[in-house]
Amino acid sequence: MSSAKAVVGSILTGEFRIRPEDMKPGATLADLNIDSLTVVELIEAVGQELGVRISEHEVTQWHTIPDLVATVEAKLAQRSAEPGR
């Protein structure tokens, strides 16, 4: 399991009270009752935990938890590829 997946899962279960069994790969954010306000809170929590910044444009591409995790993993990879890291 990637660190991004673990952190996102931990935030969703801990802060947003989403049950792990509900976080199936095909479940949409709407299936999990994650609305636009919750997405903003989720972005902030993930950003603080992993030190990544996610734009509103990137958020509009999310439909499932794997979409969210893929965005976070890409951000982490991009950050680690920067000179001086």
Task: Put a short name on every predicted segment.
Residues 1-32, 38-43, 48-85:
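Phosphopantetheine-dependent thiolation modules in NRPS/PKS and related acyl-activating systems
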